[in-house]
Amino acid sequence: MLKAESSGERTTLRSASPHRNAYRTEFQALKSTFDKPKPDGEQKTKEGEGSQQSRGRKYGSNVNRIKNLFMQMGMEPNENAAIIAKTRGKGRPSSPQKRMKPKEFVEKTDGSVVKLESSVSERISRFDTMHDGPSYAKFTETRKMFERSGHESGQNNRHSPKKEKAGEAEPQDEWGGSKSNRGSSDSLDSLSPRTEAVSPTVSQLSAVFENSESPGAITPGKAENSNYSVTGHYPLNLPSVTVTNLDTFGRLKDSNSRPSSNKQATDTEEPEKSEAVPVPEVAQKGTSLASLPSEERQLSTEAEDVTAQPDTPDSTDKDSPGEPSAESQAMPKSNTLSRPKEPLEDAEANVVGSEAEQPQRRDLTGGGDLTSPDASASSCGKEVPEDSNSFEGSHVYMHSDYNVYRVRSRYNSDWGETGTEQDEGDDSDENNYYQPDMEYSEIVGLPQEEEIPANRKIKFSCAPIKVFNTYSNEDYDRRNDDVDPVAASAEYELEKRVEKLELFPVELEKDEDGLGISIIGMGVGADAGLEKLGIFVKTVTEGGAAQRDGRIQVNDQIVEVDGISLVGVTQNFAATVLRNTKGNVRFVIGREKPGQVSEVAQLISQTLEQERRQRELLERHYAQYDADDDETGEYATDEEEDEVGPILPGGDMAIEVFELPENEDMFSPSDLDTSKLSHKFKELQIKHAVTEAEIQKLKTKLQAAENEKVRWELEKNQLQQNIEENKERMVKLESYWIEAQTLCHTVNEHLKETQSQYQALEKKYNKAKKLIKDFQQKELDFIRRQEVERKKLEEVEKAHLVEVQGLQVRIRDLEAEVFRLLKQNGTQVNNNNNIFERRPSPGEVSKGDTMENVEVKQTSCQDGLSQDLNEAVPETERLDSKALKTRAQLSVKNRRQRPTRTRLYDSVSSTDGEDSLERKNFTFNDDFSPSSTSSADLSGLGAEPKTPGLSQSLALSSDESLDMIDDEILDDGQSPKHTQSQSRAVHEWSVQQVSHWLVGLSLDQYVSEFSAQNISGEQLLQLDGNKLKALGMTSSQDRALVKKKLKEMKMSLEKARKAQEKMEKQREKLRRKEQEQMQRKSKKSEKMTSTTEQP
């Protein structure tokens, strides 16, 4: 709740700034409108508004009280007494720094303010004869505070409350606005302390005194407030004369608003006074005024009615819509002693009227003996939350704080005798009003110096130093450029925050229900009350002006109202500005931009939730105690409500239990006079009231214990529910943990399987590497053996060549011998010539003709010549080797596998070896003569079948090793059909062969796409990654496999092409050699023929 703070104290906390000066100027303009009289002549209460609105958070009464007590701690009793007399002024000027006390006060519906009477506690305080330092200073300071508030209470306005029904409680805001501005009243963030409970005892005690005593000691025109309740502690052995001076709390009581008797006895009440609304009060059993004599009760009622008549013109009850009403707590000021011997009949003169009342009051003030009863609801009255629509009401029972501050002091047993002198001394200046402008305090002066220097020319005074509370008429303009504006001015921060908001104007028409919004000031709270976040819309009243307009929403910031900025102001200031608006109201609303996290919205929602919970608790609280009151029947009648203060059970109650002394001797009524009998009766009433209070306190404690028990049961149930939830959560977590364990076991199993597979693959890989090495070694061995065989063949060919040459030489020798023999035999020369002529060439002579001619013509040497000729090989045609070559190539092609590097090398080398051997053999045959062809043919026929056999063994060995590797490494081996389909070159493959190749690679899913695109061998070799993706091969592993195979095939084709080119070159060389040999042979044959023809 916002608390009051004097502007003088505020200026000591925060220095002035240009922003603050601007706001103060605006508020002064508002204040001037409050002070103007209304057109109908009703005067607005200037003092009631607590001077100007002090910007900043208000401090409560406790702060000021404690501060003032500390200031008085070190003062002497005589100095304190002097201060009390000096600081009372004659007038009531309103200081611009006068504090506003939002405490309780009372008003009448006709506009007059009740003048309250002095309380018993104040009368008792005058008999303090033991002036003991700090305790006396505290007590006198408290009295001074009672007197100080006299000029501030009379003009404050307040609505009369009604009894709040259970379930319908609505806490009223601090500023009780009228119906027209109810919608714009500022919302409070905490419950009003008016709903707290106070002790029922003191109100019952004061009700006892109120029955028969006269309200004579009343000063006209005075109505004073106090922020503090003071309870004294008194000795237990009280003499019977002074029992009536027991401490009690003063209560606010409107004596002119009684429902029955005051309307008949009062002649000067104004006609516009509204009908009284009875407030139900808890009456204590046995203390009803009905038990008193009717004369005394009528006398007390009439006497109290007359009390407030002269005070009627002091103030009016009209509540201006723009003026916040403060709650104040009135304490009595006039102090008189009651003397038991004064007859009660003197009080009847008060019934006559105000003319006879004034002299009697002067008499009672100067030396009156009657005790002035105090209405005891000032601190313990039952506070009922106000209905904002309620203007009428007769009684106002309010208090602002349930804490009771006790001022402790010691008393002598004879305080009743010495108190009269102080009473008279204090009453002498009772009509002097306290003037806050003249307030000062004295502090201890300089100590006496023991030795004063002789040459000192000045002298220091040792008198007490007076410290006056000064007020500045002009704000101190601080021009300090070194101060950081961000750190020194909260307004600067707020203006920076407003710049980030989305601002838009809104105009509302204020109707009879107000603006339809409630505001809340969101702030940090440690910086003299400036709302660090600004003034925000807390709620929007259903059906109000703001809801009908629809533009203002909850959590919006009110930046400006009718040109008055609400940036950096207090909630009270904002509420005052809103209440002062009329007609068409212009707003500037700030709203946070979309997407931002609003801390204000969170705070407001938390505040609303807290208020809702507190309201529910309060409703249950009232419902519970209303039920208790209905059961026990402790409600008082309408007649008793005026004398007995309302009591709100529950809460912390400061119950003072007085153990009154009882005389052992019982006096008869004849031995006692009327005053003693009255005193004895009051003593018994007090005892009864105390007993009732104790019973009520025990009931309250019992109810609190039951509530605590219920709360414990709820907590126990909540804890049990939490335990069950935790158990369920633990079961869930345990199930999750078990699932995680099983998952870990599964993953471990998979890992072990993967490791075993990896080890198996590694073994296969090592075995394959070993086989490859073995194969390479065998290949090297085969090459070496082949080289050795080739050398052997060359040596054999050389031996054959030498042998052939020897044979040719021998043949020539034999032919020469034959020719010689023929010459010798002249008879056969012609026959030999005919034979040579008939034969055109040596190849045309057949074997049979030669042999016949030889047998016919031969003579003596015929047998030897025929033997030589038979040894010679007859000349035959050269054998055709093309058939053998074709046969060898076909045998190789039939066993042809995929063109791997080793197989291609084997096939090429075997073919080369074959051709070279054939060609060499036939070259030899070309050089042979007709007689040597048989040997050449034999050598050629013997070498030719040998070479294909070697190549076949090589191919077989290669096939076996590669098949073993395929079986070891590949998961799916190549089928014979697949191998046969690839016997052709890759670029010659058809679409079907490409499909077979894909099936061999376990890529069956892509066969349809390849077939649809008609991918042949040439297109297959041209495929890359993008084309494979286009063909639907999305798997990167499949694409990598196909690319790898295509790369290997391309490399194999390139090597085959190079080998083919090499073979072509070798064949070309062989052809050239054959041609050269043919030329040589032809030349040799020509030479031979020429030589044979010459002889």
Curated annotation (Swiss-Prot):
Protein name from the UniProt record: Neurabin-1
Organism: Rattus norvegicus
One Pfam family from the record: SAM_2
Highest taxon of source: Eukaryota
Protein keywords: Actin-binding, Coiled coil, Cytoplasm, Cytoskeleton, Developmental protein, Differentiation, Neurogenesis, Phosphoprotein, Synapse, Synaptosome
Gene symbol of the encoding locus: Ppp1r9a
Alphabetical list of InterPro entries matching this protein: Neurabin-1/2_PDZ, Neurabin-like, PDZ, PDZ_sf, SAM, SAM/pointed_sf
UniProt note on tissues of expression: Brain, and widely expressed in neural tissue. Highly concentrated in synapses of developed neurons. In developing neurons, concentrated in the lamellipodia of the growth cone.
SAM domain mapped to chain residues: 989-1052
Gene Ontology biological process terms in this record: actin filament organization; calcium-mediated signaling; cellular response to toxic substance; excitatory postsynaptic potential; modulation of chemical synaptic transmission; negative regulation of long-term synaptic potentiation; negative regulation of spontaneous neurotransmitter secretion; negative regulation of stress fiber assembly
Primary location group: cytoplasm
Disordered as annotated region, ranges: 1-65, 85-111, 125-394, 874-953, 1050-1095
Modified residues (Phosphothreonine): T312
Function: Binds to actin filaments (F-actin) and shows cross-linking activity. Binds along the sides of the F-actin. May be involved in neurite formation. Inhibits protein phosphatase 1-alpha activity. May play an important role in linking the actin cytoskeleton to the plasma membrane at the synaptic junction.
Oligomer status and interactors: Possibly exists as a homodimer, homotrimer or a homotetramer. Interacts with F-actin, protein phosphatase 1 (PP1), neurabin-2, TGN38 and p70-S6K.
Chain positions covered by the region annotation Interaction with protein phosphatase 1: 426-503
